[in-house]
UniProtKB/Swiss-Prot annotation:
This is Large ribosomal subunit protein bL25. It comes from Sulfurimonas denitrificans (strain ATCC 33889 / DSM 1251) (Thiomicrospira denitrificans (strain ATCC 33889 / DSM 1251)). Part of the 50S ribosomal subunit; part of the 5S rRNA/L5/L18/L25 subcomplex. Contacts the 5S rRNA. Binds to the 5S rRNA independently of L5 and L18. Pfam families: Ribosomal_L25p, Ribosomal_TL5_C. The gene is rplY. It comes from the Bacteria. HAMAP family: Ribosomal_bL25_CTC.
Length: 178
């Protein structure tokens, strides 16, 4: 379980001091809940997020335990180092928006014809309860050749889950390698 601290000072000076000490700044919020200004050790946070098996993961801040989902993050434009993360509390039986990762399944025909799979939308926005939200959206690419694309409307519907991205948005395509 990822453990964090409550930030006493939310100003620029306090934020810089926490970052210098190796902390990642986080805001934790949820429907009907008080916002929490927290900080986590950056290395522990990255290890937890990379190794999680579900969309939500447990955290402990100020003796409060909760399951959260990463809603947004901010990275430094040059170094790519994480600066800030927004975590939403995954409340049971509350319908809200989540960003679910897209995973490909199979080998595309186009890969044998000197093509590459280009995932233009690595996460799809869905509206559902946390219990009904899948951990990932699997897209079968076995019949895709160079020039083919899968759009949101081509993805199989999931029970009690609504895709909020437009139907005409391209999720992935097989492009010709240069």
């Amino acid at each position: 379980m990822l453990e964090g601290i409550i930030r006493e000072s939310i100003g620029k000076k306090g934020t810089k001091a926490l970052r210098r000490d190796g902390y990642l700044i986080a805001n934790i919020y949820g429907k009907g809940l008080q916002n929490l200004h927290a900080a986590f050790k950056e290395n522990e946070y990255i290890r937890t997020v990379r190794n999680k098996e579900t969309l939500s993961f447990p955290i402990k801040v100020d003796s409060k335990e909760m399951n959260v989902v990463v809603q947004a993050y901010e990275a430094h434009p040059v170094t790519g180092k994480l600066l800030h993360v927004d975590l939403m509390v995954a409340q049971p039986n509350v319908v809200t928006h989540y960003h679910v990762p897209v995973v490909t399944e199979g080998d595309a025909i186009g890969l044998k014809n000197k093509g590459l799979i280009h995932i233009s939308k690595p996460r799809l926005r869905v509206k559902a309860t946390i219990e009904n939200t899948p951990n990932s959206i699997v897209v079968d690419v076995t019949k895709m050749d160079v020039g083919d694309a899968k759009m949101v409307r081509d993805i199989a519907k999931i029970a009690n889950v609504t895709f909020t991205d437009a139907d005409r948005v391209s999720v992935l395509s097989v492009i010709k390698a240069k």
